[in-house]
Amino acid sequence: AWRHQYCGLFWARWNDCTYYFIDNEYYFKRGTLYGHYDDAERFAFFSRAILEMLPYIDFHPDIIHCNDWQTALVPVYYYLFYSHRPWYYNIKSLFTIHNIQYQGEYGWEVNTECVGIPASETKILEMNGKLNMMKGAIETATRVSTVSPSYAAEIRDPWFSWGLHDELNLRHYKLCGIKNGIDTESYNPETDYQLYRNYSKDDMSGKGECKRALQERLCLEQRWDVPLVGMVTRLVAHKGLDLVRMGLEELMNTENMQFVILGSGDKEYE
């Protein structure tokens, strides 16, 4: 909007790929990525910086891939402010929804303060009387994806959409689900150097050693006969933490089990 802030740009080359980093310590030198009072301003700045930096690095991307509400303003800004400029012609955008519960929903005062959408175009972001960044991305992105085909179907249902089902059903033609996966080379237990012991489908003995090492590191009783359940995730209801909380106490009291949960998120689960 009307504010001006320093924006630095750093780059690094690793594994034949160039990475660029937006620099502004006022916005980004924080202990955590999200959950700050000025998140709307921080991510509006970041989204605008992504588009502004492209001519400076002389890079014309075929596609800009945006993830969740934190970069939802990128396709909105491109549509309103950049798509008509010759240098920016024909850049496509893909917006991926990882968790539809978090939509970047704010009062309209943030538009005047930092988002900066003209009054004549605010309908792009309007939902239930508020500014909704994810809604704007769904409307303006070239394509919208989710982390699985089943999730793409779920979020078109009012029960799972957190209010965005009408928008998604209206634009169902550009919505698809692409199943999340892992890099099977990096996360290969037979070769992964970060494991305490390597193992494979033909020799599983190393897995028991990894379990024992984890028990030792976390000061758990080192027993091979006790199931050790691990969960690394965002600690939010969307990831099933409400179900975990319901069952965890009963299992801990009635079964001989060990649980290791790693993550951050909602205070009630932390």
Language model features with spans:
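Catalytic cores of nucleotide-sugar-dependent glycosyltransferases that transfer UDP/GDP/TDP-activated
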Residues: A1-E270
